[in-house]
A protein has these predicted regions:
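ATP-dependent adenylation/nucleotidyltransferase module used to activate substrates
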Residues: 2-267, 272
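ATP/NTP-dependent adenylation/nucleotidyl-transfer catalytic domains that generate, transfer
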Residues: 3-6, 11-24, 48-50, 253, ...
């Protein structure tokens, strides 16, 4: 039996030996156990009356869901899936499997604007959220993808300040912050100038299909805690946006909890084996290591993903190509452009591009 000196008493919930035996039984020793204790206390904290657990059908989400089902003594958790309007059949089947396995109901929330419609109306994702966001702003102001200092360009495009700073690489303090400029991405500026996009670029699908539906559900549902299966070691914009597993929001009606934040790949694999868990066919059959929005061009490995989709869900593959095809081709052209410069076939010094 564990010693209570190991616990941080963060709630008025009366923990009993029975509860700790439950945790010891389900969670192997090590980081899984220590992190599970924190999650148990947070879920059963008296302050939280209704908890939104965001279920995606991915492997991290599966682990978090398994925790919640086993830890939620007072049944405060509501399991919610945000349907983007472009989902794998494998994911849909897995959600049904999870409902049957755990005897729960997963609430499906539709996108405010489904991804196919959003891409048609607002633009298609290209390369990354930041790149798409800034290119969208520039496109809306009929930017000509030209060179010039920020001050020179601002005279021509006075209502596009932030995106111009990204393009010119100049900021108010006079310093170039390379991490957030177009020049920080190798040869991207040169490629865009040589091959201006002929289609609208945007990151709005993330907003309308995920962020906005989540905000609306939280407001209308009266939740006071939101749980998300983000892990620090997985990287990406989501993980980099946080420094800890918990955010107490003074300006919102709910707090954010990321119970798996400090869980490593090894911890996760150990837990899956210990519990005999089964992930969706995207992992078990297709061989995916991780999943994001299906077919999204933000995925640097979208070519490999498309090959898998074409093999296992050919109809879905056609949908992805129809929706994101122009972005796929633009990304391929960018990659070939970089290869051409590196091989000397494209001469930057002579302007042969």
């Amino acid at each position: 039996m564990m010693h209570h000196s190991l616990y941080l008493q963060t709630s008025e919930f009366e923990e009993t030996p029975k509860h700790w035996e439950l945790i010891e039984h389900h969670f192997p020793c090590g980081n899984n156990l220590a992190t599970a204790i924190k999650a148990f206390q947070k879920i059963n904290y008296f302050k939280y009356k209704k908890i939104l657990v965001s279920v995606s059908g991915g492997s991290d989400s599966d682990m978090m869901l398994d925790w919640c089902v086993k830890m939620d003594i007072e049944k405060k958790c509501v399991y919610v899936f945000f349907d983007t309007g472009l989902e794998y059949e494998a994911t849909k089947r897995h959600l049904n499997y999870l409902e049957q396995k755990y005897g729960i109901k997963i609430k499906r929330i539709r996108a405010v604007k489904p991804i196919p419609l959003c891409c048609k109306q607002d633009g298609i994702p290209f390369l990354s959220k930041e790149v798409s966001q800034n290119m969208n702003r520039l496109q809306r102001h009929d930017f000509k993808w030209e060179n010039g200092s920020y001050d020179e360009l601002f005279l021509k495009y006075p209502k596009c300040s932030s995106a111009l700073r990204w393009w010119a690489g100049e900021y108010k303090d006079g310093q170039t912050r390379k991490k957030i400029t177009v020049s920080s991405i190798k040869l991207l500026k040169e490629f865009i100038q040589a091959n201006p996009p002929t289609f609208k670029i945007s990151d709005k699908c993330c907003h309308y299909a995920k962020k906005l539906p989540s905000e609306r559900e939280i407001r209308s549902g009266g939740y006071d805690l939101k749980m998300l299966g983000v892990r620090q070691c997985e990287g990406g914009i989501r993980a980099m946006a946080y420094t800890s597993c918990f955010t107490e929001n003074e300006d919102k009606s709910y707090d954010d909890f990321r119970p798996l934040f400090f869980i490593t790949d090894k911890d996760k694999a150990q837990y899956k084996k210990h519990q005999g868990m089964k992930n969706s066919d995207c992992y078990e059959v297709w061989g995916f290591i991780r999943t994001g929005c299906a077919g999204c061009p933000f995925n640097s490995r979208f070519e490999t993903e498309l090959q898998k989709i074409k093999k296992y869900e050919p109809k879905f593959y056609k949908a992805c190509v129809n929706i994101f095809g122009e972005s796929y081709e633009y990304t391929r052209a960018y990659r070939e452009f970089k290869k051409g410069v590196h091989s000397g076939q494209i001469r930057m010094d002579l302007g042969m591009f």
